Design a protein with these regions (language model features):
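N-terminal metal-binding scaffold of metallo-dependent hydrolase/deaminase domains
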Residues: 1-34
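Alpha-helical scaffold segments that flank or form the walls of functional sites
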Residues: 40-41, 58-128
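Divalent metal-coordination and catalytic microenvironments
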Residues: 5, 20, 25, 38, ...
Length: 337
């Protein structure tokens, strides 16, 4: 298979006209040549933090605080999940997965509520889809054993030492929320030696020093943080210290659109477009241990083809900036997963 157009090549997303040569799902070559194609070829997205279980309750809880919305065990999300039957939860998640696939997401890192059964429900929701998520079980060691790792709610919610050690012994991924409500749980989260931290809205200089010294990646979800009224993470400062990826967080409060997350982060921070696009692709893949997120030889051919001649993208003078700040679902020509 060949994919032609203006290709955003490598980790710097250098625009080159040509074709991506794909064999058996792997990028074999990138050939520079005139193609006459108006397509823009970018890596498919990696959504580095999601909770798609609450797809059953989109826009529920308007005006509620963070704790009232999502804090375990009795936040609105958890009450709704307990009161909803399995079939409905699977069907709602399946529609979210379909939406992510259609909008160019190759993988998502899911903090999966519900223990072992929660992991099983997500796998049922993935039937006939090409999206390949990284599933982090929650609540129990058994859920971790049945998934790709463990996603902890936050150090203030319990003692995660035993689960952290079990996850390490299993050679799996351990992520934890930190600094979402305030700074109090950031040091305890770092003490667990996590593979990555999520949110870090209230990160302070001493935390940044520890994060940099220990090379702990960060996942930020700025749209979600605004909805829950906790502030916004210092994305620019984090990006100067560590690997930063973007996530869309709860479907209850935000659509799982990486286009929207990129645009918001770009306009919030005014970071270079290439930096933001890395946060939506390569950096999430790096955190999750995936072989995608960048167009180069030997990578998995997870590609998103945009129409560079759409009403929205035509006449763009900076292709990467246009992709980050204005591209959307309507501009997609094809998704190759």
């Amino acid at each position: 298979m060949n994919v032609e157009g203006t290709i955003l090549v490598g980790p710097e997303f250098e625009p080159r006209e040509g074709r991506v040569v794909v064999e058996d799902g792997e990028i074999q070559a990138i050939e520079e040549t005139e193609t006459g194609s108006s397509s823009i070829v970018i890596p498919a997205f990696v959504n580095a933090h999601t909770h798609i279980g609450d797809s059953i309750a989109k826009e529920a809880g308007g005006g509620l605080s963070l704790d009232e919305l999502v804090a375990p065990p009795d936040g609105l999300k958890h009450r709704l999940l307990r009161s909803t039957d399995r079939e409905t939860k699977v069907a709602a998640m399946a529609r979210t997965v379909k939406q992510m696939e259609e909008t160019g997401t190759a993988s998502f890192v899911e903090f999966r509520e519900g223990g072992v059964d929660g992991v099983s429900m997500l796998r049922d929701a993935l039937a006939r889809r090409q999206v390949d998520p990284v599933i982090l079980g929650r609540e129990t060691e058994a859920a971790m054993n049945e998934s790709d790792g463990f996603g902890a709610s936050g150090a203030r919610d319990g003692d995660f030492d035993q689960l952290r050690n079990a996850t390490r012994r299993a050679g799996k991924l351990f992520g934890i929320h930190a600094g979402e409500r305030d700074a109090a749980d950031i040091h305890p989260a770092l003490d667990l030696d996590p593979d990555f931290l999520v949110h870090l809205v209230h990160v302070e200089e001493l935390h940044l020093d520890r994060i940099e010294d220990n090379e702990v990646p960060a996942v930020v979800c700025p749209r979600s943080n605004l909805v829950t009224n906790v502030g916004v993470p210092p994305i620019r400062q984090l990006a100067e210290r560590t690997t930063v990826a973007l996530g869309t967080d709860n479907v209850m409060t935000n659509s799982p659109s990486m286009f929207r997350e990129m645009e918001f982060a770009a306009k919030l921070t005014d970071l270079p477009a290439e930096t933001i696009l890395r946060m939506a692709t390569r950096n999430g893949a790096k955190i999750a241990g995936l072989n995608c997120g960048v167009i180069e030889e030997g990578r998995d051919a997870k590609l998103l083809v945009l129409d560079g001649d759409s009403d929205n993208l035509s006449y763009a003078k900076d292709v990467v900036r246009a992709v980050v700040r204005r591209a959307g679902h309507a501009d997609i020509k094809r998704v190759h997963l």
